[in-house]
C-alpha cells in the first residue's frame, strides 16, 4: 500500500511538472522606440524585457558568434538589389545601455548573404563560412580582424536563377549549420512554388566535409528550409510550405531531420498532425507514398514563414529550458495575422502549434517588424534580428 501511495505521489508530481511546463507564458508589454520615432509595444514573458541593441541596418538576417566572442550578422540590403549585401561585426556591447557601440562592415558587395558560421578545426585554425545565393565560401579567420586577411575559398556552387524575382527567382537564400560530427549542412530552396525540379540540389539539405569535399544529399523534399540548427547530435530545420493550397494549408513546419528522409514536397504536405497528397502532383499517390513522410516536430499555421530557430538547454525559471524559440517571419498577406512573432516549442514536441513567446510586430494591421533569427547569449538572454525595421533586439531578464 505504501509503495502504491509513493507511485501515485510521484506520478502526480511528474504530472504537475509537465502541466507547469506546458502552460503558455503570460506576456506583458514593453515599450520600444526606434531612432526614426516609431514607438510600439513588444510583448514578452513578464520576467523578460527588451531593448534595441543595434539599428539603422537594412535586411538584417542571421547571426553567429566568432571564436573571439564577437557577434557577426548578415544584411541582404533589400529585395530590389541583391548585390549590396554586407556582413557586419557587432562589437563593444554596452551592458548598461544594452547596445553595441560599434557596427563594423566586415564584407561588402555580396549577393544575398543570408547565413554565416564559424568553426575551429582540429589543428586550432579558425574558419569563417558564408552562404551566398550562388556560392558557399570559406575564409581563414584571424581573431580580432575587422576585414578578412585571407582569400575566399569556393566550397560549392548553387543555381542562381528562378521563376519569380527579377534578380534570381524563388528562394535566394542558403543557410549553413555545422555539426559536432565535423560536417557542414546547407539548405537550398526550390526554384518555384510547386513544381517537379530539374536539378537535384533544389529543395534539399546537402551534407559535406568542412572543406567542401564529399557532398551528398542529406534530406530531400524541403521546399524552403531557411532555418537550420545543430543541437547536440541532431540537425533541426524550419520549412515553408507551398502557397497554392489556400489560406489554411499547408502547415509551415519544423523538423528534427532524419538522414535520407524525403519530406514530401511537392507531392505531399502536412496540415495539422497529418500528411496529405497534393492533388495537383500526386492525386493517386502514384509519385510518392505520403505515409512515408515524417511528421513535423512543430506544425505552424499556414504561411507563418518560420525562419531562425534556437535551442535553450537551460533556463533560470524553466520557461526556456528544453525548448526551441522559432522566429515566425509572417505572411505577406497581413489580413491572415499569421506569424510576426516568436514562439516556443518543446524539443521533443510532435506537430506542436507553438506557444506565443514574443509578440507585437504586427498590431492592428501595422507591421513594426518581421523576426528572422535568434541567437542565445545566456540561459534567458538572446538577440533577435528584424529584417523589416533593420533592427537587432536584445531580450534579457529584468
What are these regions (language model features)?
Residues 101, 107-119, 132-178:
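Asp-box/WD-like beta-propeller blade repeats and closely related beta-sheet repeat scaffolds
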Residues 53-57, 105-111, 155-160, 164-168, ...:
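Surface loop/turn motifs at the tips and blade-to-blade linkers of beta-strand repeat domains
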Residues 56-59, 83, 102, 109-112, ...:
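Beta-rich catalytic cores
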Residues 71-73, 126-130, 184-186, 235-237, ...:
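Hydrophobic beta-strand segments that make up the repeating blades of beta-propeller
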Residues 54, 64, 117, 177, ...:
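Conserved beta-strand position repeated across blades of beta-propeller domains
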Residues 76-78, 131-135, 141, 189-191, ...:
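Short loop/turn segments immediately following the C-termini of beta-strands
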Residues 21-46, 173, 190-193, 203, ...:
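Beta-propeller domain segments
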Residues 72-99, 144:
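Beta-propeller domains
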